Structures are given as C-alpha cells and as structure tokens.
Amino acid sequence: ATGEEAYTLTMLTLNTLVRLGVAHEATRGNITLPADWKLEVLGTDISRQAIRIAREATYIERREGLSSFRQFPPAYLRFFDLVNCDDNDRKTWQIKESVRRHMRFDLHNLMNPLPPQRDFDVNFCRNALIYMDQEPQKIIVRALHQALQHGGCLVLSLVDTMAVPNLYHENRQNKCVLYEKR
C-alpha cells in the first residue's frame, strides 16, 4: 500500500496519547512523546512504487476527500501541511514531520517466511489473507508470529481467517479480531 493505513494508525495513536495526557501537542499536529517512549510504525509492500509514494507522504485531495484516506476525521488534517493548490482548486497535502519521524517503509514480500523485523507489539495484516490459499496463509501467519514479541497481538480483518490457530489466543471485540501470541 502507499502509506495511508500506516500513517492513519500513527495519527490515531498520537491523537489518543494526547487525549490520555501521555503526549503533548505543542502546536497543531506537532506532538511530542515522553523521552522514554518510542513509537515506530513499519509499513511494507512488495511494490517499489508503493514504497516510494509512502515515503514521499504527499497526497492529493479529490472531491470525495483526501486521496484514499477514507472516512478521515477532519480534525486529523492538523497532521498535514498544505503544499500546493493548483488552478483547478486541487490541493496537495504532505504529512507533517512530527508524524513521519515515527514511520519507516520497506520492501517486503509477505510470502517471505522471515519477518522484516522482530519484537513488534502489534502486527496489522488486514484484508490480505483472503486473497490467498491456505498454505500461503500459513507461511504469512507464522512469519507474523515470529515478528511479534511474547504477548504481542496480530490484528486481522473479520474476513481474514486464522490459518494457524494454535499459535495465538483469539480475542474478538466488536468489528476487530485480535490474536495474542502464545
């Protein structure tokens, strides 16, 4: 993907930390975490072009809203800087450095049995497994399991199925399924 999901997750996390009083918002969209906190979000894709777009962090506003940031709360525009407005009133926005500093985007094939990194607290893999047969699903779910620290969670969508259920403890909450690493 081109970064929208990973950036939205980071914005949501930063916004929540401010609301909880853990982080401080000095100016609009510029959030500072406590010195002993680390927030790092890794977005991966198999496409070099998708990774390039994600790293640029620049998105065009269309009639239906800001690029493919769907159902995006207007208050979250504070995490963007307006970088261009053309003659057709099309706006180009770039995600602020205060969000981008928590991001990393790397090439990675989900079918690689080795994870790109280890000791994650949470892995999100939503709406990807539904396009694969059971054996590729098992490879991916095992790699995601290896990438999690003990007690970490894997988040799938409701349409994804767990190919290796004995690796996780399942926890269903509303429209979300969390799998805690055993």
Where are these regions (language model features)?
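Core SAM-dependent methyltransferase catalytic element
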Residues: 164-182
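Conserved class I S-adenosyl-L-methionine
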Residues: 1-3, 42
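Extended basic-aromatic, gly/pro-enriched interface segments that bind polyanionic ligands
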Residues: 18-120, 124, 128, 136, ...
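A short glycine-rich, Lys/Arg-flanked "PGG" loop and its adjoining helix->strand segment in the class I
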Residues: 138-150
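Conserved beta-strand signature within the Rossmann-like core of class I S-adenosyl-L-methionine
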Residues: 150-158
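Short, well-ordered alpha-helices that flank and scaffold nucleotide-derived cofactor binding pockets
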Residues: 11-18, 56, 146
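Helix-to-beta-strand junctions that scaffold the AdoMet/dcAdoMet cofactor pocket
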Residues: 17, 132-133, 148-149
